[in-house]
């Protein structure tokens, strides 16, 4: 039995929440205990570019990207739990980081 920590990141929070719900459902079917999902702080990356290619430095445009995150802890994971997680079909726009913790 071990503890597994999943960190999920995505640009769209709706896709992220659907993915988290699918993971929680799959883990609970195997009998493991789930802690979370814990919402992580949203990271905002802002980019400022000039509108004009030559002059008018005062005229600028600003763009931003928001990266939403969730964290799940799976307590007392069994080999069946790990197998169900590997077979799970997740959205391609969600980045999943898996870390096996100690007991």
UniProtKB/Swiss-Prot annotation:
Molecular function terms from GO: structural constituent of ribosome; tRNA binding
Signal peptide bounds: none
Pfam family, one: Ribosomal_S10
Cellular component annotations (GO), alphabetically ordered: ribonucleoprotein complex; ribosome
Superkingdom as given in the UniProt entry: Bacteria
UniProt entry keywords in alphabetical sequence: Ribonucleoprotein, Ribosomal protein
Gene Ontology BP terms: translation
InterPro entries on file: Ribosomal_uS10 (IPR001848), Ribosomal_uS10_CS (IPR018268), Ribosomal_uS10_dom (IPR027486), Ribosomal_uS10_dom_sf (IPR036838)
Cited function: Involved in the binding of tRNA to the ribosomes.
UniProt similarity note: Belongs to the universal ribosomal protein uS10 family.
Binding partners and assembly: Part of the 30S ribosomal subunit.
NCBIfam families registered for this protein in UniProt: PRK00596.1, rpsJ_bact
Protein name: Small ribosomal subunit protein uS10
Organism: Campylobacter hominis (strain ATCC BAA-381 / DSM 21671 / CCUG 45161 / LMG 19568 / NCTC 13146 / CH001A)
